[in-house]
C-alpha cells in the first residue's frame, strides 16, 4: 500500500511540474520558460512583458510576428539562437503526453488485475525510461535556446525528469516483489507452508524445519555416562 502511494505521489508531481512549462505563454501569461529583452517566451509563442502584444499560439517563433505589430522592432532570441531551433520546443508537448501516459499506468497499478501483471509492470518500467529521456531532452533544449535566461519553469522540467526516474525505480521494486511472490507460490512445499517474512505478525510464527530437526535429535540423543 505504501509503495502505491509513493508511486502516485511521484507521478503526480512529475505531471504537475511538466504542465507548468507546457501551458506557458501565450496560453498563460504568468508562466514562461524564459524572459529576455522585454519578452517572455513559452512553448507555443511569446509575449511582451507589458502584455500588450502576444504571438499566435503555435510551435516555433518567427521574426515576422513582431514586425506585424512594430516595423521598427526586431525579436532577438537569447544566446543568438536560430528561429529554427524554437521548433524543438515541441519536445515539451511530447514530454507532457509521455508523463500523462505514465501517470495513467501508475493509477492502474491500484487495480489488482493490473498490479499482479508482470508484463504490464515491465511495460510501465520501459515507458518510464522513455519518459525520462524525453523530459530531460526538453530541459536541455531550453538551455540550448535560452541559455542563462531560463526561469523556474525550466527547472521544474528537470525536477519532473527526476521524479520520473524515482517512479521508474518504484515500478522496478514492485516488479521484483511480484516476482518474489510468484516464486513463493510456485515453490514446492517440502517442510510446511512457506510464509513471506513481510507477512509475519510474530517472530514465533516462523518455523525453520532444520532447526526443529536438530532440536529433536538433541532431545533423543543418549546421554553420555
From Swiss-Prot:
Record-annotated membrane-spanning stretches: 5-25, 88-108, 121-141, 154-174
Segments on the Extracellular face: 26-87, 142-153
Membrane topology: Multi-pass membrane protein
Subcellular location, record wording: Cell membrane
A single Gene Ontology CC term: growing cell tip
Keywords assigned by UniProt, alphabetized: Cell membrane, Membrane, Transmembrane, Transmembrane helix
Family of the protein in this entry: Belongs to the palI/RIM9 family.
Functional summary from the UniProt entry: Required for the proteolytic cleavage of the transcription factor RIM101 in response to alkaline ambient pH.
Protein name: pH-response regulator palI/RIM9 homolog 2
Source species of the chain: Kluyveromyces lactis (strain ATCC 8585 / CBS 2359 / DSM 70799 / NBRC 1267 / NRRL Y-1140 / WM37) (Yeast)
